Amino acid sequence: LSPDELLALGQKGRKQTVKRGQTLVWEGDDSLVVANVISGVLKLSVSTADGREQIVGIVFPSDFIGRPFGKESPYSVTALSDAEVCVFHRSTFDQFAREHPELQHKLLQRTLIELDDARQWMMLLGKKTAEERIATLLLRISERLSADGCTGPLLNLDEFELPMDRQQMADILGLTIETVSRQLTRIKSSGVIALPDRRRVVIHDRQALLDLAEAA
């Protein structure tokens, strides 16, 4: 979109702060809004038949949330950290998209990227070991959080705060919380990373972490 079009679109939305643990959209609700993530990290989750939560995605700054042309939300959207989003009424966004074909093209690109991403995660869950899954997740988080530099100071890729706890990591990766804790300790003991506290991660040897992630 051109700068003028971006400005026009921005004027149709409103900024909203979402506190850690607060749900922005509930699974099954009418899809009344869409949003762009300005800062923070949010999770996409669905409820299983037995009532458990399954995390199906993580969204970072610059990511888009919602189904512009959908009827209802296929998942809940909940903040993993304090976040700020720009929210648009779906009908307003739909009308703007119809008037600006370039935006529809961008939405199609986004859909294809999400499809590729889903295929990569299928491989991760189906082929990689627990250690490889955790290494992949740590790398993904460090790389995506660096995008926050577009709205603030550039973050250090090699030092960041995990937006989720151990149980949520386990849910995302299809592991038990015990396995997640054990593998994190193992990677830490090898000197590849440091864990100053429960949330903080420092990558000491990025190449070694890449090697762990790509061992499969």
Predicted regions and their residues:
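Cyclic-nucleotide recognition modules
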Residues: 57-120
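Short loop/turn motifs at secondary-structure junctions and domain boundaries
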Residues: 7-8, 24-28, 154
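Phosphate-/nucleic-acid-contacting segments
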Residues: 143-216
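Cyclic nucleotide-binding regulatory module and flanking cytosolic helices
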Residues: 1-20, 63-65, 70
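Cyclic nucleotide-binding regulatory domains
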Residues: 22-82
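Short aromatic/basic micro-patch
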Residues: 34, 58, 87, 163, ...
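Polybasic "coupling" helices that flank or enter modular domains
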Residues: 98, 102-176
